[in-house]
UniProtKB/Swiss-Prot annotation:
Protein encoded by which gene: prpC
A Pfam family this chain is assigned to: Citrate_synt
Name of the protein in question: 2-methylcitrate synthase
Active site: H235, H274, D325
Keyword hit for Transferase: yes
PROSITE patterns recorded: CITRATE_SYNTHASE
InterPro entries: 2-MeCitrate/Citrate_synth_II, Citrate_synth-like_lrg_a-sub, Citrate_synth-like_sm_a-sub, Citrate_synthase, Citrate_synthase_AS, Citrate_synthase_bac-typ, Citrate_synthase_sf
Length: 389
């Protein structure tokens, strides 16, 4: 195998990263997404992420991924109406959520809630495309309800009504979290961040969902597997760690001095670099503008200025660029989102991409079963039980 990979329909050469297993190895075909073909680009079904983030609401992108096309104005209105009607939780799902302790990891709550929903509203035999899309829409509409019903009950003993009349998924999330409708600015910020997180080709959680789908398993099982993969700190959770880093410091100068020492000591700084992008993460420029606007509106540029300074430091010292997580941490923090909910928000966005990949994998209708390079001992003589030492 060559030590470089030339992506199809592109002259851009990507060198596989030694720290990432199977880096640069194509593991299947997809018509859903391209990542880093030119080193710093991202497309969903052929549409540039910069155009989608600038012009689309999240529900438009969800429709693009799950239902295969950007909706017309009438189709978007009908889709939003459908999603609003799907925000409620069955009684037994609420009962399951009420049994989970407050100390539960929110990602475990998401996984358990989806499993309970799958037991209550299981996928029908036959696994039709229309049925899978309906389940995807139900999950998209109700994941915020699952998370925040548990959160308020476990922390305050309050049984909230998870149905709201908010126009968007992001608005619904913020309304349930804070108990009031969010500002237009916050709702717009959520639209953008969810669009940016919605899809990213064969990342670990998406590939997990495709492996499960390839076995002929149900939609819920594939989504649950993806949530489990995203729970791992090497995949999801980078924005949570990014905020922890930023909150260590009181000033940009203090942050710069400490990070330069850590870089000299070969410490890894989470929030920088990417397994696929080689030039820059195209999502970064978008979320950075969002973070700055939210910080200005909130009357505090402290976290933004620290994050901005460290962006400069990491480029000067390591030639490492920030990824989406670095300034999404600032954005979510400015909207009052608890740090432990950053990765669940990732789930709410990415369920659209996961669902699209599951549907696509089913159409391929092949089980995924790669081979392994055996590195163990060969031709060992068998030793009888009584003679082993």
């Amino acid at each position: 195998m060559s030590d470089t990979t030339i992506l199809q329909n592109s002259t851009h050469v990507i060198k596989p990263k030694k720290s990432v297993a199977l880096s640069g190895v194509p593991a299947g075909n997809t018509a859903l997404c391209t990542v880093g073909k030119s080193g710093n680009d991202l497309h969903y079904r052929g549409y540039d992420i910069l155009d989608l983030a600038k012009h689309c609401e999240f529900e438009e992108v969800a429709h693009l991924l799950i239902h295969g096309k950007l909706p017309t104005r009438d189709e978007l209105a009908a889709y939003k109406t459908k999603l609003k009607a799907l925000r409620g939780l069955p009684a037994n799902v609420r009962t399951v959520l009420e049994a989970l302790p407050a100390a539960s990891h929110p990602m475990d709550v998401m996984r358990t809630g989806v499993s309970a929903l799958g037991c209550t509203l299981p996928e029908k035999e036959g696994h039709t495309v229309s049925g899978a899309r309906d389940i995807a829409d139900k999950l998209l509409a109700s994941l915020s309800s699952i998370l925040l019903y548990w959160y308020h009950y476990s922390h305050n003993g309050e049984r909230i009504q998870p149905e709201t009349d908010d126009d968007s998924i992001g608005g619904h999330f913020l309304h349930l979290l804070h108990g009031e409708k969010p500002s237009q600015s916050w709702e717009k910020a959520m639209h953008i961040s969810l669009v940016l997180y919605a899809e990213h080709e064969f990342n670990a959680s998406t590939f997990t969902s495709r492996v499960i789908a390839g076995t002929g398993s149900d939609m819920y099982s594939a989504i649950i597997g993806a949530i489990g993969a995203l729970r791992g700190p090497k995949h999801g959770g980078a924005n949570e760690v990014s905020l922890e880093i930023q909150q260590r410091y009181e000033t940009p100068d203090e942050a710069e001095a400490d990070i330069r020492k850590r870089v000299e000591n070969k410490e890894v700084v989470i929030g920088f670099g990417h397994p696929v992008y080689t030039i820059a993460d195209p999502r970064h420029q978008v979320i950075k503008r969002v973070a700055k606007q939210l910080s200005q509106e909130g009357g505090s540029l402290k976290m933004y200025n620290i994050a901005d300074r460290l962006e400069t430091v990491m480029w000067e010292s390591k030639k490492m660029f920030p990824n989406l997580d670095w300034f999404s941490a600032v954005s979510y923090n400015m909207m009052g989102v608890p740090t432990e909910m950053f990765t669940p928000l990732f789930v709410i966005a990415r369920v659209t991409g996961w669902a699209a990949h599951i549907i696509e994998q089913r159409q391929d209708n092949k089980i995924i079963r790669p081979s392994a390079n055996y590195v163990g001992p060969e031709d060992r003589p068998f030793v009888a039980l009584d003679k082993r030492q």
